[in-house]
Structure formats: structure tokens, C-alpha cells
């Protein structure tokens, strides 16, 4: 299974990027995970720009999504919602064919638990006709990271392993 992992934060030391990076150690054998790092390079969405030729960063994101079997998105919560940069990326994908029907594991990690952002993301992804596997919203603080940014909380690793197993099942033929 090939997965594009999208951290919803632009922060250099993002806990959500750390969560997705840890997925490689708990995902089913044979899983290839690519961490998307272009969120900050996407132009602000405008329907006027969503015509051929579309902006290169948008074309690259759509191509990356088209080349994988599934997505994994992890988002923090800012002011009771998903970050604007993540919503911007999703807005660029609304008119694209690549995400339709694609399985997506959604997890949200934030010191507050990210419940509001998680609910927003569920609504948006379902509206986009994506096959959402709800990995849940988790209370996640920097205290659960080691010095190299690895996750030290066994309960988070277990939840991530379960989510990726469900994602693999959703990608299985038949």
C-alpha cells in the first residue's frame, strides 16, 4: 500500500508530522509512506486559478495523490478548527478527480485533543467523496516525543497501528 501522509501543520517541529512519521514503524509490512511537505507552498485557493494550466504546486499535489492508494492526514487544532493551510489544500482538491473514493486515515493530535478540527475534517473529506477511516482525535503533547521527535506514548502508537491496518484493509482488492 502506498500512502501520502499529510501533516496539517506548517510548524517545523510539528507533532502531527511526528505522528505520521512514526507510522512507518507500526504500519503493515509493505506499506510505503511519503510525507507531504508542500502544504506551505500552495497558493491561496481561487476558483479563477483552478483552470488549466493549474499552478505547479497544485498539479504536483494532485499527481502525488493520484499515484498512491490512500492518504493519511493528521491535523492540529487552531481556534477550534483545522489550520487554514490544510483547508486551503483541501479546497484545491475539491474539483480534482484524484481524491474521489480514495481511502483516507484521519487522525488529529493536539494538546486540546483537536476534536473540533477533527469534526470539520470529517465533514470536508466526506463531502469530497473520500472513504474516511476515522482514526480518532487524540490528546497529544510534545511531552510524548523523544529528543529525536519520535513518539514515546504506546497508546498513540497502538491507535496509529490500528488505523493503518484499517487503511490497508480498505485498500485491499475485492
Placement of each model-derived feature along the sequence:
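N-terminal beta1-alpha1 ligand-phosphate binding loop
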Residues: 1-31
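A general structural signal for well-ordered alpha-helical segments in protein cores
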Residues: 3, 16-20, 42, 58, ...
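Short hydrophobic segments within beta-strands
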Residues: 6-8, 36, 107
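Short, glycine/serine-rich, charged loops/turns that create anion-binding
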Residues: 10-11, 40, 97, 111
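Short beta-strand elements in bilobed, periplasmic/extracellular small-molecule ligand-binding domains
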Residues: 31-40, 44, 132-140
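N-terminal beta-loop-helix "entrance" segment that forms/cooperates
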Residues: 38-55, 145-148
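Helix-loop-strand module that forms the ligand-binding subsite of alpha/beta enzymes
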Residues: 53-131
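Glycine-rich phosphate/pyrophosphate-binding loop and the adjoining helix
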Residues: 131-174
Amino acid at each position: 500500500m502506498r500512502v501520502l501522509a499529510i501533516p496539517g501543520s506548517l510548524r517545523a517541529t510539528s507533532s502531527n508530522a511526528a505522528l505520521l512519521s512514526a507510522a512507518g514503524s507500526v504500519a503493515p509490512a509493505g506499506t510505503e509512506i511519503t510525507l507531504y511537505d508542500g502544504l506551505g507552498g500552495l497558493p491561496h485557493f481561487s476558483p479563477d486559478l483552478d483552470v488549466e494550466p493549474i499552478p505547479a504546486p497544485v498539479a504536483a499535489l494532485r499527481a502525488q495523490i493520484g499515484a498512491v492508494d490512500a492518504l493519511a492526514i493528521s491535523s492540529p487544532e487552531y481556534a477550534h478548527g483545522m489550520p487554514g493551510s490544510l483547508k486551503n489544500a483541501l479546497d484545491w482538491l475539491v474539483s480534482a478527480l484524484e481524491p474521489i473514493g480514495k481511502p483516507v486515515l484521519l487522525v488529529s493530535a493536539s494538546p486540546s485533543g483537536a476534536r473540533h478540527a477533527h469534526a470539520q475534517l470529517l465533514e470536508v473529506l466526506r463531502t469530497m467523496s473520500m472513504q474516511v477511516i476515522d482514526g480518532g482525535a487524540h490528546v497529544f503533547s510534545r511531552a510524548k516525543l523523544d529528543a529525536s521527535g519520535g513518539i514515546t506514548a504506546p497508546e498513540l502508537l497502538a491507535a496509529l497501528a490500528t488505523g493503518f491496518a484499517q487503511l490497508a484493509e480498505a485498500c485491499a482488492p475485492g
